[in-house]
Amino acid sequence: MKVAIVAGTPGAGKTSVLIHTIRTLINEGYKPVVVKIDCLYTDDDVRYKKLGIPVLVGLSKDMCPDHFAIYNFEEMVDWAKDKGDILLIETAGLCHRCAPYTKNSLGICVIDATSGPNTPRKVGPFLTSADIVVITKGDIISQAEREVFRERVLEMNPNCRIYEVNGLTGQGCVEIAKEIIESKDIKDLENEELRHNAPLCICTLCVGETRVSKKYHRGILRRIDGFMEYEGE
């Protein structure tokens, strides 16, 4: 089965880009299915269901959505196998440190050109380890700003393929669909691995500690000066 994982910051247009891409995939005779990962709430599944495709929603709630998606990856693929031939996973995009792509999936980063020229330097592995970077909202900034933004993306990920896409009209989504169609299948799910390590977990805050004093905290901790240490038994 082909698996494409779509990551990006909130409001970048991930769902809109995927909807236009799915229409192209359907027109080409494919049977895409979608898993939508979010934190506390989503109604994006309603938009997907209007396309007449199977949709599964996963809410991570108190768990990091990146860890949640990774932990449930095998279950998502198993769910999709008898429903379609392409699995599209839309992640929550909660933090800039997300690293959701696996080695044999197609990693798609959706990033908003209006978020500022330094954003590509801030977002980490979901851009730097992506196969494809989709730049949205480029039509509402100047040509000079678009060129600077594009160069910053290439600075952080020189091997990626960049597409400028309009989430409203769908312009550019045919090319995204073609990339998905031409991507490789995941054949050995048991040995599939992440491209980049996930954000750090577990610390005392992760398991419910609310006191802020440093003396109450255990686990893998990073100090303000950048030093990382382990506190505990």
UniProtKB/Swiss-Prot annotation:
PANTHER family, sorted: COBW_HYPB_UREG NUCLEOTIDE-BINDING DOMAIN-CONTAINING PROTEIN, HYDROGENASE PROTEIN ASSEMBLY PROTEIN, NICKEL CHAPERONE
Xref: Pfam families: cobW
InterPro entries hit by this protein: CobW/HypB/UreG_nucleotide-bd (IPR003495), Hyd_mat_HypB (IPR004392), P-loop_NTPase (IPR027417)
Gene Ontology BP, a term: protein maturation
Species of the source: Methanocaldococcus jannaschii (strain ATCC 43067 / DSM 2661 / JAL-1 / JCM 10045 / NBRC 100440) (Methanococcus jannaschii)
Protein's name in the database: Uncharacterized protein MJ0120
Molecular function terms, GO-annotated: GTPase activity; nickel cation binding; zinc ion binding
